[in-house]
Regions:
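Flexible hinge/capping segments at coil-to-helix
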Residues: 90-105, 128-130, 197
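Short beta-strand-to-loop elements that line the ligand-binding cleft
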Residues: 32-39, 57, 128-142, 177-180
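Short beta-strand and adjacent tight-turn residues that come in two discontinuous sequence segments
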Residues: 38, 57-58, 76-78, 108, ...
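Short, well-ordered beta-strand elements
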Residues: 1-10, 31-37, 103-107, 135-136
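A structural signal for short loop-to-beta-strand junctions that line the ligand-binding cleft
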Residues: 2-5, 71-80, 100, 104-107, ...
Length: 197
């Protein structure tokens, strides 16, 4: 028996795991797999540490943070080789490049997801403490509301999820500018499979 804790709600990101279950690939290998959906109130490292799962999917920065706090996690598989993380910004804010972030409010996911962003801003020499020469960091929930409600000039999005939610809300691609972390040289590995040592 193997209980796999997803890091987020059931969506296309995890399709391969569900297809393998449906097609019997796990049972062909004598594995009885239960897939546990994640969500905004579920921290996969805590579920793994508490014995609620045998394996978890997690981003590397979050897994490294958990390991630094004493949870002996190890990566046993890395299905995603590139990052889908990006910032999605309103074009009418005048943002054309990262240097234009100064004086703006940017929504950032936390719980280990903030590290690539902080690394990026450090490389750009932009303070994350606010002010006209820095940026104001908004602790973004796992939704697109701060952008749609104009609480933030930019928000964290995934190419395969939240960006589509912004478009589905009636926003045109012409109204947006995006910055993929891969293109900025600060992307980290996502969706690794981790177990305890």
């Amino acid at each position: 028996e193997v209980r796999l804790q997803l890091q987020w709600v059931t969506q296309a990101q995890f399709a391969g795991y569900y297809v393998a279950l449906k097609k019997g690939y796990y049972s062909d290998e004598d594995l009885d797999v239960t897939i546990l959906p994640g969500g905004p109130d579920i921290a996969p490292p805590q579920v793994l540490a508490g014995g609620g799962a045998d394996a978890m999917l997690n981003w590397m920065p979050s897994a490294l943070a958990a390991r630094e706090k004493g949870l002996p996690v190890v990566n046993i598989a890395q299905p995603f080789k590139s990052s889908g993380l990006m910032l999605t910004c309103w074009k009418d804010t005048g943002i054309k490049s990262p240097s234009d972030f100064k004086g703006k409010t940017i929504g950032v996911w936390f719980y280990g997801n903030e590290y690539p962003f902080l690394s990026w801003m450090s490389q750009e020499g932009i303070s994350t403490d606010g002010g006209k020469d820095g940026i104001t960091v908004l602790r973004q929930g796992f939704n697109v509301d701060p952008l749609l409600q104009r609480q933030a000039d930019c928000i964290s999005t995934m190419t395969y999820n939240e960006y589509g939610q912004v478009l589905d809300a009636g926003v045109s691609e012409d109204e947006l500018v995006t910055f993929k972390y891969e293109d900025q040289g600060v992307a980290t590995l996502e969706d690794g499979m981790y177990v305890l040592e």
